[in-house]
């Protein structure tokens, strides 16, 4: 009797199965109403995102390049023939590449194209606010006593507006001391001289010598004076 009763109970009460699955339409929202954060496996398609207008960006970049290049010598990336002639478009080199090939070292804050690292775009030389004492001649300190005028000219020749180097060597006031080198570099105008000054300030000529001095440049107070040249050529 007891066995028959329990068999009837088992037939009437089946063990509960798993949760019933709802149709997909019950829990899936239309693709147009789903947000990015809805569902862990959903990723928006490319057409769902806003695509910037590349034509607008390109035209703005073109205007930026034109504004940078509109000034005289607006960048330190300049083309100049190796023989010291006028600027040429076929032999363009940056001052960074030129100096690295010579073995020199630029300051740590020196950025590409001769500009210091910063968030502002490079300002064209013609639009730069020059100091009141700016002149077209730079006075350079920190050159080794045995350097020649040709070596100094190699450093400044890539800059637009470069004219010539005047090197004067004086005897030291101390016995057995190294000669004193006075260096003057002439440019066509103060703006070109300011570009070279900002690019080469703190430049070290020889990275292999631990005691190599850093160049210190400033505008010459007497740009018109031309002392006798006793420097090595």
Swiss-Prot record:
Residues 136-222 form the RRM domain. The keyword Cell inner membrane does not apply. The lineage of its organism: Eukaryota, Viridiplantae, Streptophyta, Embryophyta, Tracheophyta. GO terms for cellular component: nuclear speck. GO terms for molecular function: RNA binding. Keywords: Nucleus, RNA-binding. This is Nuclear speckle RNA-binding protein A. Expressed in root meristems, lateral root primordia and root vascular tissues. Its main location: nucleus.
């Amino acid at each position: 009797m007891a066995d028959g009763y329990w068999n009837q109970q088992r037939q009437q009460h089946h063990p509960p199965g798993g949760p019933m699955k709802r149709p997909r339409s019950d829990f899936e929202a239309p693709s147009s109403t789903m947000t990015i954060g809805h569902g862990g496996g959903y990723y928006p398609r490319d057409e769902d995102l806003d695509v910037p207008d590349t034509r607008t960006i390109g035209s703005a970049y073109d205007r930026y390049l034109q504004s940078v290049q509109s000034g005289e010598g607006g960048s330190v990336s300049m083309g100049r023939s190796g023989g010291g002639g006028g600027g040429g478009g076929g032999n363009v080199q940056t001052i960074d590449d030129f100096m690295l090939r010579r073995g020199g070292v630029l300051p740590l804050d020196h950025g590409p194209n001769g500009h210091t690292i910063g968030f502002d775009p490079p300002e064209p030389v013609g639009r730069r606010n020059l100091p009141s004492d700016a002149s077209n001649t730079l006075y350079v300190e920190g050159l080794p006593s045995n350097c020649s005028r040709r070596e100094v000219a190699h450093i400044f020749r890539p800059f637009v507006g470069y004219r010539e180097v005047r090197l004067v060597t004086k005897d030291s006031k101390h016995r057995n001391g190294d000669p004193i080198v006075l260096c003057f570099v002439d440019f066509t105008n103060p703006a070109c001289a300011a570009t070279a000054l900002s690019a080469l300030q703190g430049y070290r000529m020889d990275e292999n010598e631990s005691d190599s001095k850093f160049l210190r440049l400033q505008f010459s107070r007497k740009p018109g004076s031309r002392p006798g040249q006793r420097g090595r050529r």
